[in-house]
Design a protein with these regions (language model features):
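Cytosolic-side transmembrane-helix boundaries in multi-pass membrane proteins
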Residues: 312-331
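Hydrophobic alpha-helical segments of integral membrane proteins
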Residues: 8-10, 15, 60, 64, ...
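Short amphipathic alpha-helical segments with coiled-coil-like heptad repeat character
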Residues: 84-85, 165-170, 330-331
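Transmembrane alpha-helical segments in integral membrane proteins
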Residues: 47-71, 145-151, 225-244, 310-314
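Transmembrane-helix bundle segments that line or gate the permeation/cavity pathway
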Residues: 1-121, 174-177, 181-185
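Alpha-helical transmembrane segments and, especially, the helix-loop junctions at the ends
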Residues: 3-18, 143, 259-265, 284, ...
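Membrane-embedded translocation segments of transport machinery
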Residues: 96-242, 249, 254-308
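Membrane-interfacial loop-to-transmembrane alpha-helix junctions, especially the N-terminal start
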Residues: 11, 248-249
């Protein structure tokens, strides 16, 4: 839910934000566009999945090799032994639940704002706290129903359809957009990301005011960590029977490369419009802080925007219906 909603919310908005407010160099230049994708990759790349891999591997190892419960407390077994079954273990699980709630709250906020923005774009539904409270109630009801239903065939089918819709929308943007440019941009983005990975990782803005690092990098690290109990538990459950090498390769590189592809298709398509002076209305939304509207404004530049906007709203809503069935009961 966290990654899915974030990918919808930030795929266009984050690159454009870094483009018009470049932390390095001059804004709104070709160089700023290139750097914007590197920064986006940095926040959505291997660091996030490394956090999930550490938690997931710890849980999987102790659960499947030592027959311990598939809960966060089991990772502390080498330190406190059988006391994981007592108050200390219970406290660890409670902290994990509270941490996950912070991640859910963040994702819920982004998701509700974007759903409201999509409804405003399509049906002129006002963007207001009242509408958003109603949406929160509906989404909470959907998530509660999902938890009560459990991981049955219907939930699995819903998850598969969600993935199918996401890939279909991404392929549409790829085909309807600057296809050849996106292929080259994907390759170059990865190269630039690898080239600057160490520098960005150790950048704490020691010689500056640290505002950008706090607002972006530290925010993302906190968001990924808050989701790590849930995502790590899910990864552990589906990884039984894999070797550690297979686990690390599958968790770190597969999702990262797909995320990079997603961000390239959406982000570079919008950046190309911006560099060519064709995205002034979208850039104005970014400047005005109307970030939830940015994705729909971008889709409006492509054919069949009404259909793709509906699909985007569905993709934001559906992760809540998939969130937290079996895993949430185990956290």
């Amino acid at each position: 839910a966290g990654m899915g909603i974030g990918l919808m919310f930030f795929a266009v908005a984050e690159p454009l934000t870094h483009y018009i407010a470049a932390p390095l160099g001059d804004p709104e230049t070709v160089e700023a566009a290139e750097q914007a994708m590197v920064l986006t990759f940095f926040h959505w790349g291997i660091h996030a999945w490394a956090v999930y891999a550490i938690v997931g591997l710890s849980l999987a190892y102790f659960a499947f090799r030592h027959n311990l419960p598939l809960t966060i407390r089991s990772a502390l077994y080498p330190l406190i032994g059988d006391r994981i079954y007592g108050p200390i273990g219970h406290a660890v699980d409670v902290v994990a639940i509270l941490g996950t709630l912070f991640g859910v709250a963040t994702s819920l906020g982004y998701g509700v704002n974007q759903i409201n923005a999509g409804l405003n774009t399509l049906f002129d539904v006002p963007i207001s706290p009242v509408v958003q409270v109603v949406l929160i109630g509906l989404i909470t009801a959907l998530a509660t129903t999902s938890v009560l239903a459990g991981l049955d065939a219907g939930i699995k089918r819903l998850s598969e359809w969600n993935l199918f819709l996401a890939i279909a929308l991404m392929l549409f943007v790829f085909i309807a957009g600057p296809t050849l440019f996106l292929i080259g941009a994907y390759v170059q983005n990865i190269g630039d990301y690898i080239d600057q990975l160490a520098v960005l990782t150790f950048n704490v803005d020691a010689y500056g005011d640290g505002v950008w690092v706090n607002d972006w990098t530290l925010f993302y690290w906190g968001w990924w960590i808050s989701w790590s109990p849930f995502v790590g538990m899910f990864i552990a459950r589906i990884s039984r029977g894999r070797t550690i090498r297979e686990f690390i390769f599958g968790v770190l590189f597969g999702p990262t490369l797909f995320t990079f592809l997603w961000m390239t298709i959406y982000g570079n398509s919008a950046l190309l419009q911006a560099v060519n002076g064709m995205a002034d209305p979208i850039l104005q939304l970014v400047r005005d802080g109307d970030t939830p509207l940015v994705l729909f404004a971008f889709l409006d530049t492509l054919p069949f925007s009404a259909i793709t906007s509906v699909l985007a709203i569905i993709l934001v809503i559906r992760p809540y219906g998939l969130f937290g069935t079996h895993e949430i009961e185990r956290v």
